[in-house]
From Swiss-Prot:
Tissue distribution of the protein: Widely expressed. Expressed in heart, brain and liver.
Entry-linked InterPro entries: Cyt_P450 (IPR001128), Cyt_P450_CS (IPR017972), Cyt_P450_E_grp-I (IPR002401), Cyt_P450_E_grp-I_CYP2D-like (IPR008069), Cyt_P450_sf (IPR036396), Cytochrome_P450_fam2 (IPR050182)
Gene name, Swiss-Prot/TrEMBL: Cyp2u1
Subcellular location per the Swiss-Prot or TrEMBL entry: Endoplasmic reticulum membrane; Microsome membrane; Mitochondrion inner membrane
Assigned protein family: Belongs to the cytochrome P450 family.
Protein name, per record: Cytochrome P450 2U1
Cofactor(s) this protein cannot do without: heme
The keyword Ribonucleoprotein is assigned to this record: no
Enzyme class: oxidoreductase
Organism: Mus musculus
Amino acid sequence: MSSLGDQRPAAGEQPGARLHVRATGGALLLCLLAVLLGWVWLRRQRACGIPPGPKPRPLVGNFGHLLVPRFLRPQFWLGSGSQTDTVGQHVYLARMARVYGNIFSFFIGHRLVVVLSDFHSVREALVQQAEVFSDRPRMPLISIMTKEKGIVFAHYGPIWKQQRRFSHSTLRHFGLGKLSLEPRIIEEFAYVKEAMQKHGEAPFSPFPIISNAVSNIICSLCFGQRFDYTNKEFKKVLDFMSRGLEICLHSQLFLINICPWFYYLPFGPFKELRQIERDISCFLKNIIREHQESLDASNPQDFIDMYLLHMEEEQGASRRSSFDEDYLFYIIGDLFIAGTDTTTNSLLWCLLYMSLNPDVQKKVHEEIERVIGCDRAPSLTDKAQMPYTEATIMEVQRLSMVVPLAIPHMTSEKTVLQGFTIPKGTVVLINLWSVHRDPAIWEKPDDFCPHRFLDDQGQLLKRETFIPFGIGKRVCMGEQLAKMELFLMFVSLMQTFTFALPEGSEKPVMTGRFGLTLAPHPFNVTISKR
């Protein structure tokens, strides 16, 4: 009888078969062990006082289906998670808050995510504990594309504070100082008016006209120039940006966050994204180079000029500085992408709500006629005398909430929020859509009612709970400029036209298209000259 250590394969058995079986069994055992350890780890996390939430699955957490392309997601496996495919993530998370509370948590893989769904928890986190809740989560796709520079996605720290402080003060300068964008916005509206009137009484989509106008205002701010709506290079860059955002949000590019080297795959959306990056980079870097060649220290014309002058000042002081061409490039990208998409969609929502609510549109027309008349362009100085128009814009912002989940935050250290433990490195989602639909704060929150922003005397009522631009250290740095654009462009549109939906058309779906921003579904309007 042979010993156990001297066993030989039976007759006819392949020599490597037993080894293969043992290896397979060992691999399965390791997988089971990993699943068990993951399950134990997740259970321990729940026991450590973190906010309540659904039970996570081992390894994949609560949203494992998000790791799989939509067309490969089997319905039987998704269960309730499939609702994220039929409603926006902001709506789905708001529904979860009804079950688990205004502060709840879930896991994506092993990553803990905490969602804040009401104003009080948002204010405590972003204002009262701002130093803890102001970082950004590490995401390989974003890190590769931005080199962790710029303002929007950069990590919170001394360099970010320097760049943010300069950018914010420069934007304020353009909003209030001698380089104010007000006349440029009014000038741009002349092109909007001309483009819309070409359609006569025929239905048309306002999207390309509004998008071109808002993009040109950002170009005036950043580049000191505007582009004709028929300029092929300008249209191409806008198309690149739109396509880049689309494939980042709705394709297999999310796999880069799991395996960063996927970014370099030579096919599909991976290859397309790299080409889009190269084309946009070429466009922006050419403009920066032109500014360097024509820079006049005594007469800065735009954001790039101001940044280049500050760079020279820092270098002349012979001190280490974070101000360089790389940072300028990514900040310009932030301003262009974030500033164009959000304001464009806010204006589109305004036109849609006016088309659906002719009674409100009529009151806006009456206030414009009373304060401004028909013979002069609107000015920011008119704002104080136009509370109903302001309230209308604010109500559209509240209901549309074009950035429904804000940009994700991350905790830089362990903390406690309203009695719950929030570990260091937790991803924090701010559901601004839920904050602005909270029935505890907003009466009949789903109704369109501008009067909720007016007091008994018809004057504008400033509500602390109205935070469409966010709050805290990461509040939108372009808030003032966005408000200026929205007011001047909206009033100019209302002063000139009456908007309506085409006769016989169906009412557009008002849920919006969830992406980087919450855009209205495509719609057409008709106009009549006033």
